[in-house]
Protein backbone atom coordinates (compact mmCIF):
# COMPACT_ATOMS: atom_id res chain seq x y z
CA UNK A 1 0.00 0.00 0.00
CA UNK A 2 1.28 3.46 -0.86
CA UNK A 3 2.13 5.92 1.88
CA UNK A 4 -0.51 8.56 2.52
CA UNK A 5 0.87 12.05 1.83
CA UNK A 6 -2.25 14.20 2.29
CA UNK A 7 -5.56 13.93 4.10
CA UNK A 8 -8.34 16.49 3.78
CA UNK A 9 -10.79 15.71 6.56
CA UNK A 10 -14.30 17.17 6.61
CA UNK A 11 -13.15 20.38 4.93
CA UNK A 12 -15.68 23.21 4.79
CA UNK A 13 -15.23 26.72 3.44
CA UNK A 14 -18.03 29.21 3.90
CA UNK A 15 -18.27 32.84 2.82
CA UNK A 16 -20.77 35.48 3.83
CA UNK A 17 -22.40 37.46 1.03
CA UNK A 18 -24.73 39.99 2.56
CA UNK A 19 -27.09 37.98 4.74
CA UNK A 20 -26.37 34.74 2.88
CA UNK A 21 -23.82 32.06 3.78
CA UNK A 22 -22.22 30.57 0.66
CA UNK A 23 -21.00 27.02 1.28
CA UNK A 24 -18.21 26.56 -1.26
CA UNK A 25 -16.86 23.38 0.34
CA UNK A 26 -19.12 21.47 2.70
CA UNK A 27 -17.59 18.53 4.56
CA UNK A 28 -15.23 17.41 1.80
CA UNK A 29 -12.86 14.46 2.27
CA UNK A 30 -9.83 13.40 0.21
CA UNK A 31 -6.90 11.06 0.79
CA UNK A 32 -3.91 11.18 -1.56
CA UNK A 33 -1.22 8.49 -1.70
CA UNK A 34 2.42 8.79 -2.65
CA UNK A 35 2.88 9.00 -6.41
CA UNK A 36 -0.86 9.20 -7.11
CA UNK A 37 -2.15 11.43 -9.91
CA UNK A 38 -5.50 12.97 -9.00
CA UNK A 39 -7.68 15.17 -11.21
CA UNK A 40 -10.57 17.28 -9.96
CA UNK A 41 -13.15 18.62 -12.38
CA UNK A 42 -16.19 20.77 -11.76
CA UNK A 43 -18.09 23.74 -13.06
CA UNK A 44 -16.77 27.29 -12.76
CA UNK A 45 -17.30 28.55 -9.24
CA UNK A 46 -17.58 25.06 -7.77
CA UNK A 47 -14.62 25.66 -5.45
CA UNK A 48 -11.79 23.86 -7.25
CA UNK A 49 -9.22 26.62 -6.74
CA UNK A 50 -10.39 27.13 -3.16
CA UNK A 51 -9.80 23.44 -2.53
CA UNK A 52 -6.25 23.66 -3.91
CA UNK A 53 -5.50 26.75 -1.82
CA UNK A 54 -6.60 24.94 1.33
CA UNK A 55 -4.68 21.77 0.43
CA UNK A 56 -1.61 23.93 -0.25
CA UNK A 57 -1.90 25.75 3.09
CA UNK A 58 -2.50 29.04 1.30
CA UNK A 59 -5.96 29.42 2.85
CA UNK A 60 -7.61 28.09 5.98
CA UNK A 61 -10.84 26.09 5.98
CA UNK A 62 -13.83 27.25 7.98
CA UNK A 63 -13.92 23.78 9.47
CA UNK A 64 -11.95 20.57 9.03
CA UNK A 65 -8.33 19.46 9.00
CA UNK A 66 -5.49 19.40 6.48
CA UNK A 67 -3.10 16.60 7.48
CA UNK A 68 0.31 16.07 5.89
CA UNK A 69 1.78 13.05 7.70
CA UNK A 70 5.40 12.58 8.74
CA UNK A 71 6.70 16.09 8.25
CA UNK A 72 9.53 17.81 10.07
CA UNK A 73 8.14 21.33 10.06
CA UNK A 74 4.97 22.82 11.50
CA UNK A 75 5.04 26.36 10.12
CA UNK A 76 3.05 26.68 6.91
CA UNK A 77 5.69 28.54 4.90
CA UNK A 78 8.27 25.83 5.66
CA UNK A 79 5.85 23.03 4.78
CA UNK A 80 5.14 24.74 1.46
CA UNK A 81 8.86 25.19 0.79
CA UNK A 82 9.96 21.66 1.64
CA UNK A 83 6.98 19.46 0.81
CA UNK A 84 4.75 21.18 -1.75
CA UNK A 85 5.06 22.43 -5.32
CA UNK A 86 2.66 24.70 -7.19
CA UNK A 87 1.83 25.16 -10.88
CA UNK A 88 -0.60 27.79 -12.11
CA UNK A 89 -2.18 28.73 -15.41
CA UNK A 90 0.16 31.76 -15.49
CA UNK A 91 3.80 30.72 -15.35
CA UNK A 92 5.04 33.67 -13.21
CA UNK A 93 8.62 33.35 -14.48
CA UNK A 94 11.10 36.09 -13.61
CA UNK A 95 11.70 37.86 -16.91
CA UNK A 96 15.30 38.91 -16.15
CA UNK A 97 16.45 35.38 -15.31
CA UNK A 98 17.25 32.53 -17.68
CA UNK A 99 15.19 29.34 -17.78
CA UNK A 100 17.84 27.57 -15.70
CA UNK A 101 18.03 30.40 -13.15
CA UNK A 102 14.24 30.44 -12.76
CA UNK A 103 14.25 26.73 -11.99
CA UNK A 104 17.02 26.74 -9.37
CA UNK A 105 15.57 29.62 -7.32
CA UNK A 106 13.53 27.36 -4.96
CA UNK A 107 16.70 25.37 -4.22
CA UNK A 108 18.70 28.50 -3.45
CA UNK A 109 15.95 29.77 -1.14
CA UNK A 110 16.49 26.59 0.87
CA UNK A 111 20.20 27.39 1.07
CA UNK A 112 21.27 24.32 -0.89
CA UNK A 113 24.39 23.95 -3.00
CA UNK A 114 24.20 25.91 -6.26
CA UNK A 115 26.23 23.41 -8.30
CA UNK A 116 23.95 20.57 -7.23
CA UNK A 117 20.90 22.72 -7.98
CA UNK A 118 22.18 23.46 -11.49
CA UNK A 119 22.86 19.77 -12.09
CA UNK A 120 19.36 18.73 -10.99
CA UNK A 121 17.65 21.59 -12.82
CA UNK A 122 19.50 20.76 -16.02
CA UNK A 123 18.32 17.15 -15.76
CA UNK A 124 14.68 18.12 -15.24
CA UNK A 125 14.74 20.64 -18.07
CA UNK A 126 16.29 17.96 -20.27
CA UNK A 127 13.47 15.56 -19.31
CA UNK A 128 11.01 18.28 -20.34
CA UNK A 129 12.67 18.75 -23.73
CA UNK A 130 14.38 22.06 -22.94
CA UNK A 131 18.01 20.97 -23.03
CA UNK A 132 18.76 23.59 -25.69
CA UNK A 133 16.89 26.41 -23.91
CA UNK A 134 18.70 26.51 -20.55
CA UNK A 135 20.11 29.99 -21.04
CA UNK A 136 17.17 31.54 -22.86
CA UNK A 137 15.22 34.33 -21.20
CA UNK A 138 11.46 33.76 -20.74
CA UNK A 139 10.69 36.27 -23.50
CA UNK A 140 12.65 34.11 -25.93
CA UNK A 141 10.53 31.04 -25.19
CA UNK A 142 7.16 29.96 -26.59
CA UNK A 143 4.16 29.71 -24.27
CA UNK A 144 4.56 25.95 -24.02
CA UNK A 145 8.26 26.28 -23.24
CA UNK A 146 7.58 28.87 -20.55
CA UNK A 147 5.09 26.56 -18.89
CA UNK A 148 7.59 23.70 -19.00
CA UNK A 149 10.08 25.91 -17.16
CA UNK A 150 7.40 26.60 -14.54
CA UNK A 151 6.78 22.86 -14.23
CA UNK A 152 10.51 22.22 -13.79
CA UNK A 153 10.62 24.89 -11.09
CA UNK A 154 7.79 23.18 -9.21
CA UNK A 155 9.63 19.84 -9.34
CA UNK A 156 13.18 20.97 -8.50
CA UNK A 157 12.80 20.45 -4.73
CA UNK A 158 11.32 16.98 -5.31
CA UNK A 159 8.13 17.85 -3.41
CA UNK A 160 5.84 15.18 -2.06
CA UNK A 161 2.85 16.90 -3.64
CA UNK A 162 2.32 19.11 -6.69
CA UNK A 163 -0.83 21.24 -6.67
CA UNK A 164 -1.69 22.27 -10.22
CA UNK A 165 -4.40 24.80 -11.07
CA UNK A 166 -5.26 24.59 -14.79
CA UNK A 167 -1.55 24.08 -15.59
CA UNK A 168 -2.05 24.14 -19.37
CA UNK A 169 -5.06 26.44 -19.50
CA UNK A 170 -3.33 29.09 -21.63
CA UNK A 171 -1.93 26.70 -24.24
CA UNK A 172 -3.31 25.54 -27.59
CA UNK A 173 -4.55 21.91 -27.80
CA UNK A 174 -1.42 20.44 -29.41
CA UNK A 175 0.93 22.20 -27.01
CA UNK A 176 -1.33 21.28 -24.09
CA UNK A 177 -0.99 17.55 -24.77
CA UNK A 178 2.76 17.76 -25.33
CA UNK A 179 3.44 19.74 -22.14
CA UNK A 180 1.04 17.71 -20.02
CA UNK A 181 2.45 14.35 -21.11
CA UNK A 182 5.98 15.54 -20.31
CA UNK A 183 4.80 16.79 -16.92
CA UNK A 184 3.23 13.44 -16.03
CA UNK A 185 6.34 11.60 -17.19
CA UNK A 186 8.60 13.56 -14.85
CA UNK A 187 6.10 13.45 -11.96
CA UNK A 188 5.89 9.66 -12.23
CA UNK A 189 9.68 9.45 -12.43
CA UNK A 190 9.97 11.37 -9.15
CA UNK A 191 7.02 9.47 -7.61
CA UNK A 192 5.40 12.82 -6.86
CA UNK A 193 1.73 13.04 -5.97
CA UNK A 194 -0.16 15.43 -8.25
CA UNK A 195 -3.51 17.02 -7.44
CA UNK A 196 -4.77 18.95 -10.45
CA UNK A 197 -7.92 20.95 -11.04
CA UNK A 198 -8.92 21.37 -14.66
CA UNK A 199 -11.77 21.98 -17.10
CA UNK A 200 -10.02 19.73 -19.63
CA UNK A 201 -11.67 16.32 -19.37
CA UNK A 202 -9.22 14.74 -21.81
CA UNK A 203 -6.31 15.59 -19.51
CA UNK A 204 -8.29 14.60 -16.43
CA UNK A 205 -8.79 11.08 -17.78
CA UNK A 206 -5.02 10.60 -18.03
CA UNK A 207 -4.77 10.72 -14.24
CA UNK A 208 -5.05 7.77 -11.84
CA UNK A 209 -8.17 9.09 -10.13
CA UNK A 210 -10.84 11.52 -11.26
CA UNK A 211 -13.20 13.37 -8.95
CA UNK A 212 -16.05 15.77 -9.63
CA UNK A 213 -16.48 18.67 -7.20
CA UNK A 214 -20.16 19.46 -6.88
CA UNK A 215 -22.19 21.03 -4.06
CA UNK A 216 -19.04 21.28 -1.96
CA UNK A 217 -18.24 17.56 -2.05
CA UNK A 218 -15.97 15.29 -4.10
CA UNK A 219 -17.49 12.35 -5.94
CA UNK A 220 -15.71 9.77 -8.07
CA UNK A 221 -16.30 10.73 -11.71
From Swiss-Prot:
<keyword id="KW-0067">ATP-binding</keyword>
<keyword id="KW-0813">Transport</keyword>
<dbReference type="InterPro" id="IPR027417">
    <property type="entry name" value="P-loop_NTPase"/>
</dbReference>
<keyword id="KW-0997">Cell inner membrane</keyword>
<dbReference type="GO" id="GO:0005886">
    <property type="term" value="C:plasma membrane"/>
</dbReference>
<keyword id="KW-0547">Nucleotide-binding</keyword>
<comment type="function">
    <text>Part of the ABC transporter complex LolCDE involved in the translocation of mature outer membrane-directed lipoproteins, from the inner membrane to the periplasmic chaperone, LolA. Responsible for the formation of the LolA-lipoprotein complex in an ATP-dependent manner.</text>
</comment>
<dbReference type="GO" id="GO:0005524">
    <property type="term" value="F:ATP binding"/>
</dbReference>
<dbReference type="GO" id="GO:0016887">
    <property type="term" value="F:ATP hydrolysis activity"/>
</dbReference>
<comment type="subunit">
    <text>The complex is composed of two ATP-binding proteins (LolD) and two transmembrane proteins (LolC and LolE).</text>
</comment>
<dbReference type="InterPro" id="IPR017871">
    <property type="entry name" value="ABC_transporter-like_CS"/>
</dbReference>
<feature type="binding site">
    <location>
        <begin position="42"/>
        <end position="49"/>
    </location>
    <ligand>
        <name>ATP</name>
    </ligand>
</feature>
<feature type="domain" description="ABC transporter">
    <location>
        <begin position="8"/>
        <end position="220"/>
    </location>
</feature>
<keyword id="KW-0472">Membrane</keyword>
<dbReference type="InterPro" id="IPR003439">
    <property type="entry name" value="ABC_transporter-like_ATP-bd"/>
</dbReference>
<keyword id="KW-1278">Translocase</keyword>
<dbReference type="InterPro" id="IPR017911">
    <property type="entry name" value="MacB-like_ATP-bd"/>
</dbReference>
<dbReference type="InterPro" id="IPR003593">
    <property type="entry name" value="AAA+_ATPase"/>
</dbReference>
<keyword id="KW-1003">Cell membrane</keyword>
<comment type="similarity">
    <text>Belongs to the ABC transporter superfamily. Lipoprotein translocase (TC 3.A.1.125) family.</text>
</comment>
<protein>
    <recommendedName>
        <fullName>Lipoprotein-releasing system ATP-binding protein LolD</fullName>
        <ecNumber>7.6.2.-</ecNumber>
    </recommendedName>
</protein>
<dbReference type="Pfam" id="PF00005">
    <property type="entry name" value="ABC_tran"/>
</dbReference>
Amino acid sequence: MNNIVLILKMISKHYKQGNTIVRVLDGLNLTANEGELIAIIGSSGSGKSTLLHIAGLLDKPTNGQVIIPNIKYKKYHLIRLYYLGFIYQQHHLLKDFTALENVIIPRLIRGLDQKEAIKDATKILDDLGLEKKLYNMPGELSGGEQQRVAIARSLINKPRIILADEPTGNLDPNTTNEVFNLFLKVARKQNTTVIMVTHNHELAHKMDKLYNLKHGLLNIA
